[in-house]
Swiss-Prot record:
HAMAP family: UPF0102 (MF_00048). PANTHER family: UPF0102 PROTEIN YRAN. Belongs to the UPF0102 family. GO terms for molecular function: nucleic acid binding. It holds the Pfam family UPF0102. It comes from the Bacteria. It comes from Xanthomonas oryzae pv. oryzae (strain KACC10331 / KXO85). This is UPF0102 protein XOO3839.
Amino acid sequence: MPAARQQRGAGVEAAARALLEQAGLRLVVGNANYRGGELDLVMRDGQSLVFVEVRYRRDDRFGGGAASVDWRKRRKLVLAAQLFLGAHPALAALPCRFDVVDASGEPPVLHWIRDAFRADDC
């Protein structure tokens, strides 16, 4: 991945994290890599564990970043979340949800989609 693209992605993830922290969520871990998938942000929202996918698109002509979280991507995220929970058994009993932060435009405008999909939808 080109350096400029990596830098843009890191900046958008940092902005997404700041948005969620302003809303009261707390970071558990960022950029957790597991076989077959990466979790951009894992956060706590009260007693819930939130797996956050951050997607950036320069423009939203084709549905923006959220539209790119198709069934294949959702399945990878669910698998990564299962592996995360297996590695962190103390968190495994918490209710979980999957959120998406969609970013588009220059400068990026963020939209937080709470409970964007469920594990059993995949």
